[in-house]
Amino acid sequence: MSDNESPDIKNLVLKNLTDGGTLNLENRKIGDVGAAQLANLETLAKATSLELGDNEIGDSGVAALCSSSYLSQLRVLNLKSNQITAKGAEHIALSENWSNLDQLILKFNQIGEEGAKHLAKSQVLGQISTLDLFRNHIGPKGAHAIKSSPNFTRLSRVRLD
């Protein structure tokens, strides 16, 4: 899908948002444009779980999601198998919208050591219990940053490289 095209996001949301607040749009290839459109949908104000794996979302799409006031109720954010780098991890780490987030799944991206360090320094993500960074090439230093972070006080499930 090109940068200017994305599926009809509003209709996808209306069809796929459950009464319980879960939106599963995995493998829809919505890209950064679709992520930005999602971020602007007031319909998602009560969403608690956002499943966006395999969607070709990069750092600018992540930035849009992170700046959305409509996603502040999320407890689960699944961005597995996208195109997220250290910059996207930094957006996530600095976003003030994730105070309710319990699970962050970023496996199969490219955040690297630098991205892991951004997450480890986050003052916002301290309440998460699950962090999945499998296959992100974070290396020993990135893994150490996550494991030794004083900010992850509730972390009980961690999956690293």
Task: For every predicted segment, state its role.
Residues 83, 97-110:
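A mid-sequence interfacial segment
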